[in-house]
Curated annotation (Swiss-Prot):
It is found in: Cell membrane. Glycans are attached at N261, N468. It is a multi-pass membrane protein. Gr21a and Gr63a probably form a heterodimer that responds to CO(2). Residues 151-166, 244-265, 346-350, 458-512 are extracellular. Residues 1-129, 188-222, 286-324, 372-436 are cytoplasmic. One of its GO terms (molecular function) is taste receptor activity. Belongs to the insect chemoreceptor superfamily. Gustatory receptor (GR) family. Gr21a subfamily. GO terms for cellular component: axon; dendrite; membrane; neuronal cell body; plasma membrane. This is Gustatory and odorant receptor 63a. The chain crosses the membrane at residues 130-150, 167-187, 223-243, 266-285, 325-345, 351-371, 437-457. Keywords: Behavior, Cell membrane, Glycoprotein, Membrane, Olfaction, Receptor, Sensory transduction, Transducer, Transmembrane, Transmembrane helix. Induction: The Myb-MuvB complex mediates neuron-specific expression of the carbon dioxide receptor genes Gr63a and Gr21a. Conversely, Mip120 and E2F2, are required for repression of Gr63a in inappropriate neurons.
Amino acid sequence: MRPSGEKVVKGHGQGNSGHSLSGMANYYRRKKGDAVFLNAKPLNSANAQAYLYGVRKYSIGLAERLDADYEAPPLDRKKSSDSTASNNPEFKPSVFYRNIDPINWFLRIIGVLPIVRHGPARAKFEMNSASFIYSVVFFVLLACYVGYVANNRIHIVRSLSGPFEEAVIAYLFLVNILPIMIIPILWYEARKIAKLFNDWDDFEVLYYQISGHSLPLKLRQKAVYIAIVLPILSVLSVVITHVTMSDLNINQVVPYCILDNLTAMLGAWWFLICEAMSITAHLLAERFQKALKHIGPAAMVADYRVLWLRLSKLTRDTGNALCYTFVFMSLYLFFIITLSIYGLMSQLSEGFGIKDIGLTITALWNIGLLFYICDEAHYASVNVRTNFQKKLLMVELNWMNSDAQTEINMFLRATEMNPSTINCGGFFDVNRTLFKGLLTTMVTYLVVLLQFQISIPTDKGDSEGANNITVVDFVMDSLDNDMSLMGASTLSTTTVGTTLPPPIMKLKGRKG
């Protein structure tokens, strides 16, 4: 067994020599189609162990083992082409899925994510599965419950006769019911989400084949904490809001708690997915920089280019898989934040009251959720593309052969040609610019609404009914005032036109 290991080490040393470097580079050169684009699959999703037996001879994982007196397996041993990757004790399958599984588990409880998964790379959406049937039953029951609550809220809105800001608070409770529409949207996107999970499993196998170790994501503990703490905070915020802004009715608080937990956990789910991409991109950049210290054939650079292309595709697929869900989420959060801040600012003129506590909590909670959605997506995009480009630009090409330099240049070109932004199906890029744009638009609407609020007492003057004006009354009074002004203007014009001729005639009479 020792001579075989010595033979491998010797071959590795010969690969570093200038005499046979170009020959080995040509020998290990890949087909252009396999090394260039995104359809790179693992050699076999059930064949990660074959990596150790000559599949990727010059990747950094094997180089480190050789430096650490690693004894390679005997050359006459048969390659385990049909063995599974999970049989290798060093390979840990489904790392990504296991890290976000606590959030998936919570979402499945509230009937949101009916995806069946029978093993690594075997996630799918089935309409005849028990998970989907449970999701449909849960949605129907929740829809009936929400319909009952919405009917009561509509009656409250119709019976309002107070100031306009009180109507805004009533509308706020009505808008809080809208997240129930997210559940059927996620049914529509469940197949794309299942494909995203499968692509992550394939990426993990490819990462193991190239780097020599499993993907070291360590997000499960954070996911467990989020799955426990976030629902508690969400329920507390809903209860405090109902206590301070309306009469507390337990029967009507329950659906609000479920829907608020739905939006909060979807935000946490998005946060963990983007965090996993950021950590993976950082690890890949560090491994690639370390791999460049080992002089080897140019195929090693091509391996990492293929791996980066797969990660870049995962970044884009994340936005496409959750396209309509997060478009709806962004619009919903924008609407809720605008209404809550307007209600808060319109009542501050009378002093900070108990209703302002609920409005403040609602505004801060949803602003924080929107910020984390945009910020984590921005951070993931920067790590996948910008930071990786910095690593490539810092590579010293002087000591590399021409083939390796060509591969580095192709790598840089690939990072420029393949965008790594998280785009929601072409609607918008999810990044900090989106958050800034929504806030700017929000300020514009708030200025208009506050001007509308300030103009109410000026139109009614000092009349006794000024404090009980409704929105409809204000609009009708504004129209009456406009019509009165137009009538007065027309009358004055007619009077001037009819009274001007007599003075002229009198002047002519005097001259005569």
